[in-house]
Amino acid sequence: MITVSRNHVAASWLGPAVARVRAIPCATPLVLGAIVFALVGSAEPTAAAATGLASTTMLADAPSTPDGAQPRLASDPAQLADDLVADERALRDPSTGEAALMAAAHREQVAYRAIGRHPEWDATTRPRIPPSLLGIYDGNVDARRQLTAMTSVRGTLPAWRVEPPAPADELLSYYHQAESDSGVGWNYLAAINLIETRLGSIDGDSTAGAQGPMQFLPATFAGYGQGGDIHSPHDSIMAAGRYLAANGFASDRDHAIYRYNHANEYVHAVDQYAALIAADPAAFATYYRWDVYCYTTSGDVLLPIGYAATSAIPVADYLATHPQ
């Protein structure tokens, strides 16, 4: 059974004026059985003032924006790059309204996914990015390519539920609490949370049995969770901090991240997203708005908030009733 609804974020904190990690494709897990999903495709918070999440359900047969429909981007790489620049600027403009921020973040995510799969476009797209945005562009494209390299194309969609993540200010408080307790940088915990489950939006076990927002194997969580709940954002983020600290994060950060997931590509992607989240005031707010995608035999498939499947679904069957 599949159910789908569309959910929108309504949080004053998420505006670019605030100072301050799928769609990552569905992935085959490593070590902790990471769900490396494409959200993939974050700023340095101090005291974030966020509201909760407000949802609006849209009928699946709505003619203008069918439920689960992806943003439509230019097919020409040069125009795609120009549109991406416009969206990146809108995401950093304090006057941009929430609806426009959401739309820009969704387009940005899809653009980075497309550019990530087409390195032959680099000679066209990269020169069109202004110097002020080039670091953001390079970091996102590189992270996307690293994650793509470690994931497999799927013929079925996973048995997941896609739900709104915890409120942004709550997640930020958990990352900072874990940093204070473990010494592991808050931005690295956010990057891992982003890559693993799109900040907790994906509710589903990996094929290796990893669970929860930070994708722990139950046996591993038992050693670092201090009796907490593997499905709790707070408890799993705190456990991730302890795990990384115990594996030498302070002296060899990349080794500790590799212990979390045995893939050099994973380590590199975490490093890139963590750097972006720490350096760019708009980054986390933008990533928080990203969707969940799976890279399939039919291309990218958007799994919107409200997607729920109790067993794997052939991609063609899903697309027959949920056009992209």
Label each residue range with its predicted role:
Residues 61-172:
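N-terminal export signals and maturation junctions of secreted/periplasmic proteins
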Residues 120-304:
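Catalytic glycan-binding domains that act on GlcNAc-containing polysaccharides
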Residues 37-62:
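C-terminal region of N-terminal signal peptides and the immediate post-cleavage residues
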